[in-house]
Design a protein with these regions (language model features):
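Short loop-beta-helix segment that forms the pyridoxal 5′-phosphate
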Residues: 1-17
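Glycine/charged-rich beta-loop-alpha catalytic/anionic-binding loops adjacent to active sites
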Residues: 1-2, 141-145, 189-192
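Acidic/polar loop patches that form or flank catalytic/metal-binding clefts of enzymes
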Residues: 2-4, 58, 87, 117-118, ...
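Short glycine-centered, acidic/aromatic-flanked micro-motifs in structured strand/loop junctions
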Residues: 5-7, 62, 89-92, 257-259, ...
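Short, conserved micro-motifs enriched in small and acidic residues
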Residues: 7-12, 151-158, 196-203, 222, ...
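Conserved PLP-enzyme active-site core in the AAT-like
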Residues: 12-180, 268, 295
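Non-catalytic terminal extensions of PLP-dependent enzymes
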Residues: 19, 26, 130, 183-196, ...
Length: 359
């Protein structure tokens, strides 16, 4: 119902959205609620954001179909009850599956007085087709770089707008645009929890997203989402005769393959396969995420790839798999043809060089 563009990135949106939930409970003198439920398949930023607002995190396991284990969730809700501030959930989730129990899940949380937070990381799969509010979510953040075509990477600037149901609008950060008769006014609600960024955040990033939405329109947005789902299912089907899929059936905009058997039989890891892809001039997919899938490769072709590009990628995946079986030792050396081969990623993480240093 209402939004703010102040948050400067997706994770910043999570933090800001959780502050919104916290302000709501505080206004009701219900500050005993200090626990957030997060599925074990969640993005790592979810528990990190909850911790930053001094919430304790309760992890709920996934069931064999990749969705939230509804019985485990019921047990947590029965035990914690009035301690629950809310639940954070991505839907479709990080294994690319739309949770069939989503209405039951959000109702369980609402019935004990908690709020439901929608991580918009996978909104690309449902935009124009389904609304988080209709699923029972009270707060949502959007990743403009993931869903609305704003620049991705390069150090920013970014934008992670948050939206909420009408009953939460008075807690939103900063000033809100309110229509009064024939003019608009800027209003700062008394219960607003403060500011998280100057003015309206990285406003030019928001304008780029607006240009994308206005260019595509309702039909174009829906088509982009449909193509993302179609492309993912096409690639999943074509690769399923070679790779082990983490979960069977129709996926949404992405799917996850498990290379655990390849690792066991030939000592070729998901990292080896990803590095080998660089020799073919193709960007490797996300590795080792979600953590609930061992030796995971997450494939998300997106809505922009045509069939020819996907067929080429499928061919490369299969060639690499064949190499892994016939010559596993060389897989540990790849890439062989790049300017820089295997970087010392541990050193880069522990001792990052974040600015130019003259010799």
């Amino acid at each position: 119902d209402k939004m703010t563009f102040q948050p400067a990135a997706g994770a910043h949106g999570e933090f800001s959205g959780l502050l919104l939930i916290k302000a709501y409970h505080k206004s009701r003198n219900d500050e005993k609620r200090h626990k957030i439920i997060v599925p074990d398949s969640a993005h790592g930023t979810n528990p990190a954001s909850a911790s930053m607002v001094n919430y304790d995190v309760i992890s709920v396991p996934s069931s064999s179909d990749g969705c939230v284990d509804i019985e485990a969730l019921k047990a947590v809700v029965a035990k914690e009850g009035e301690n629950i501030a809310g639940l954070m959930l991505t839907n479709p989730n990080t294994v690319g599956i739309f949770d069939k129990n989503i209405l039951e899940i959000t109702k369980l949380i609402h019935d004990v007085g908690g709020l439901c937070y929608y991580d918009g990381a996978n909104l690309n799969a449902v935009m124009g087709w389904a609304r988080p509010g209709d699923m029972g979510f009270d707060v949502v953040h959007l990743n403009l770089h993931k869903t609305f075509a704003t620049p991705h990477g390069g150090g920013g600037p970014g934008s992670g707008p948050i939206g909420c149901k009408a009953f939460l609008q008075e807690f939103l950060p900063g000033y809100q645009v309110v229509q009064k008769d024939d003019y608009f006014d800027l209003v700062r609600y008394e219960k607003s929890y403060g500011m998280v960024k100057e003015f309206y955040g990285h406003f030019l990033v928001v304008l780029k997203a607006l240009a994308y939405v206005m260019t595509l329109g309702k039909e174009g947005i829906s088509e982009a989402s449909a193509n993302a789902v179609l492309n993912a299912n096409y690639m999943k089907q074509e690769l399923s005769d070679t790779f082990n899929m983490a979960y069977d059936g129709i996926c949404m905009h992405e799917f996850v393959m498990s290379l655990e058997q390849l690792k066991h039989d030939y000592n070729v890891s998901a990292l080896d396969v990803a590095k080998a892809m660089l020799d073919y001039g193709i960007h490797p997919p996300t590795m080792y995420f979600p953590l609930i899938v061992h030796e995971a490769l997450m494939v998300e072709p997106t809505e922009t790839e045509g069939k020819a590009q996907m067929d080429e990628a499928i061919k490369i995946y299969k060639e690499i798999y064949k190499t892994a079986i016939e010559n596993p030792d060389i897989m540990h050396e790849m890439p062989l043809n790049t300017v820089v081969r295997r970087l010392d990623e541990v050193l880069a993480a522990r001792k990052p060089i974040l600015r130019y240093q003259a010799e």
